[in-house]
């Protein structure tokens, strides 16, 4: 990998969302990414050109380990749903203009079903335009509602929490 990467978080802040971000960051650095940008508040933040250089915030192996255990969404999240491509081409043009400005080689989005929809739409638009940026979705959802998956990261944590809570209620009754 020779270019820059941008990563965002979207949807609910599950236990897996920051672990996924730590894994994306570490892998990108290990594979030679020049810069790893983080979208503040997901795709909505990117549309507002609100992003940070993660290497300024994650500087040591300890920072990566702490990020894995940090609650909530480190970059901030959103629930903004991209319009269909033909309904609002200007939105897509704006996103791709920002990606070009940052020289993004790979766009990574961590989230649930709507986040994977965002990745699909951006990937489809890149194909239509012949744009070289690669788009990758990192699934995490407590709802376990992603097509073609059995269990998504985040779902196991939610199921365990519910099971433990029910067990404690039974013991207290």
Positions of PLM-derived features:
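N-terminal phosphate-binding or glycine-rich loops at protein starts, especially the Walker A/P-loop
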Residues: 1-52
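Short acidic, glycine/serine/threonine-rich loops at helix termini
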Residues: 17-20, 47-53, 86-87, 118-123, ...
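Short, ordered loop/turn segments at secondary-structure junctions
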Residues: 10-12, 39-45, 79-80, 112-115, ...
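Short, acidic/small-residue loops that bind anionic groups at enzyme active sites
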Residues: 36, 123-152, 156-161
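Short Gly/Thr/Asp-enriched flexible loops that form oxyanion-binding sites at enzyme active sites
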Residues: 19-24, 113-133
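Solvent-exposed alpha-helices and their adjacent loops that cap or buttress functional pockets
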Residues: 1, 6, 29-31, 65-69, ...
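Glycine-rich oxoanion-binding loops at beta->alpha junctions
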Residues: 50-105, 114, 142, 151-162, ...
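Short glycine-rich or small-residue beta-strand-to-loop segments that form or flank ligand, phosphate
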Residues: 4-14, 73-79, 105-111, 137
